[in-house]
Amino acid sequence: LKQAFVKYENFHEDTMKKIGISVTDPTDWTGLALCNSIKHFGMEPLVFSLGEATSKIPAGKLYSGKIDLMALDAVIVRDLGPSTRNDVSFRFDILCQLEELGIAVINSPESIARAANKYVSSYMFRKNGIATPGTVVTNCVDEALEALVSFGRAVVKPVFGYKGIGVECVRNDEKGILKLKELMEKNGLVYIQEFIPNPGRDIRVFVVNNELVGSIYRIAPEGSWINNLSQGGTAKPCILTPEQEKLSLRASDVIGTTYSGVDIIEGDRDYVMEINGTPSGKGIFEACGVEVTKNIAEYVRDSIK
């Protein structure tokens, strides 16, 4: 009987679906929550870093640490990690290669790239009739200054940025002009977005598999205008209006994400600011008790049956 049980146990382990979770920080809250949610749905989570990935072309091997990436049934991209231009290109190449091998990659490399590139996402929002603030992206100092004059007050962001890092709010005055020139000289390119007067908060909406999972207000700390939770913002429960629901679902659909965090600002109307293709689930869990990672894990389970 004992031998039979061992055989059954080994069979169960061998047939359990293996789900890779790409993280940078192994202690990341969302990464750990994804592991628990994957286990909850009877699958095996395998945490790895794309920053440690290796491809041996003659041998036909692709692995990260001790994990054979080609043996996975699916990959959830929680984080690509900081990287150089060559490095990030290689990481996307790996994800594309896994897709070609028939391994489900969530979110898809294409949708992650669209979401990560603020220029591309802003362009796609406008192209598809989604309200988004006026935006100018340019290598030209004169064009940048002209945009600042037009907007009066603007937000300057890195095209590829996260967690509110490197974001500046500038006015059309001497200080703002100097800051804009400084950013242009430093980066060679500026992404300038019209500042939308708002109630001191934005809305983060979580969408999974074309369904609204939950939403929170992200409220800027006193003395700041940046709402990101990683920059000291506070999460509070939010009930969406029908228009905000429509905007969120449309934005996710246009970018092509399976799961995402859509950021909306309340001004004279609702605007989609940007979309996060690798959002944290911590804020909405602490504010509302919503476990976004369970929705993601359930989608993965159903998609690889």
Located regions from the model:
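N-terminal amphipathic/basic-hydrophobic helices that include classical n-h-c signal peptides
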Residues: 1-15
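Active-site nucleotide/adenylate-binding loops and adjacent lid/helix of ATP-dependent enzymes
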Residues: 17-24, 34-36, 45, 95-96, ...
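Conserved N-proximal alpha/beta basic substrate-recognition cap immediately N-terminal to
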Residues: 25-132
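Short glycine-rich anion-binding loops that position phosphate/pyrophosphate groups of nucleotides
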Residues: 80-82, 160-161, 278
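Protein kinase-like catalytic core scaffold
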Residues: 154, 191, 213-214, 260, ...
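Phosphate-binding site of ATP-dependent enzymes
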Residues: 165-255
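C-terminal active-site "lid" helix and adjoining low-complexity regulatory extension at the edge
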Residues: 253, 257, 266-305
